[in-house]
Design a protein with these regions (language model features):
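Short catalytic micro-motifs in class I SAM-dependent methyltransferases
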Residues: 112-119
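Short glycine-dipeptide loop
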Residues: 133-137
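Flexible, active-site-proximal loop/turn residues at the rims of small-molecule/cofactor binding pockets
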Residues: 117, 126, 143
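Conserved class I S-adenosyl-L-methionine
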Residues: 138-160
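A short, conserved alpha-helix within the catalytic core of class I
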Residues: 120-132
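Active-site loop signature of alpha/beta-hydrolase-fold enzymes
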Residues: 80, 103, 119, 144-147
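Conserved N-terminal segment of class I S-adenosyl-L-methionine
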Residues: 1-106, 114, 124-127, 153-155, ...
């Protein structure tokens, strides 16, 4: 089996490791952080598959700014990405290079699963392991079964999701409904929030997104997607 996370192919295809999206994703999950119960003014956090480590750093900074002592661990299959995370976030206390089910520690107050579950083949088994690792789990799950992605799937002669797998390393593709169903099967959902990426792409100052906004068809997709979200029941 090809290990795209250690043969550098994933980083070659995604050289920024999505740092341009970090602030947007953090703002989406920030609303959940105040719900995490902190005992004795201390919190132990595990960031799984944290990419460049920027979202983990923002979470860590959030608790530090609130006067909380943080123990922060990063777990990843990729040794190179762990080095990048440590460089971007020197306050990481421990890096763990193994799969989730091999994690040598437990009793985490918070586990971060930000854009990770779609990469893991055994997602059901992984969810059970996560329940053993931590008291609170924050997921961010990309919604890739939607109106426009289905159109792209049909237009590509049913090859679109195969290409997405090669490009992004995604094994599973979720709709909003299937993501909620997955979470309910394995966890007690305390809160959830959905903000489509169209708003991020539409207003981000990131150079590639600025260029994309000059594309006529891309603009149509963004505007219609945002309109649907704003005008249909959620």
């Amino acid at each position: 089996m090809i290990d795209i996370y250690n043969d550098d192919s994933y980083i070659e295809k995604n050289p920024t490791l999505h740092t341009e999206d970090s602030e947007f994703k953090f703002q989406n999950i920030k609303r959940f952080l105040s719900s995490v119960q902190v005992k004795n003014n201390r919190i132990k956090i595990l960031d799984i598959g944290g990419g460049a480590g920027m979202i983990g750093k923002l979470v860590l900074d959030y608790f530090l700014e609130n006067g909380i002592v943080v123990t922060f661990h990063s777990l990843d299959l990729s040794t190179r990405m762990l080095k990048i995370q440590l460089k971007n976030n020197p306050l990481i206390n421990k890096i763990i290079n193994c799969s989730i089910d091999e994690c040598p520690e437990s009793n985490y107050d918070l586990v971060l699963m930000i854009d990770v579950i779609e990469h893991i083949e055994g997602k059901e088994y992984t969810a059970k392991i996560l329940n053993k690792l931590g008291k609170n789990i924050i997921y961010n799950i990309p919604i890739e079964i939607n109106f426009f992605d289905i159109l792209k799937y049909l237009k590509s002669n049913f090859r679109y999701y195969k290409r997405q797998k090669v490009r992004w390393g995604h094994i599973h593709f979720f709709s909003f409904t299937s993501s909620q169903s997955f979470l309910r099967r394995h966890h007690k959902i305390i809160d959830s929030y959905f903000q489509p990426y169209c708003f991020h792409y539409k207003y981000s100052d990131y150079e590639s997104y600025l260029k994309l906004r000059h594309d006529f068809f891309w603009n149509i997709e963004l505007n219609i997607s945002c309109w649907i979200f704003n005008n249909f029941p959620k």
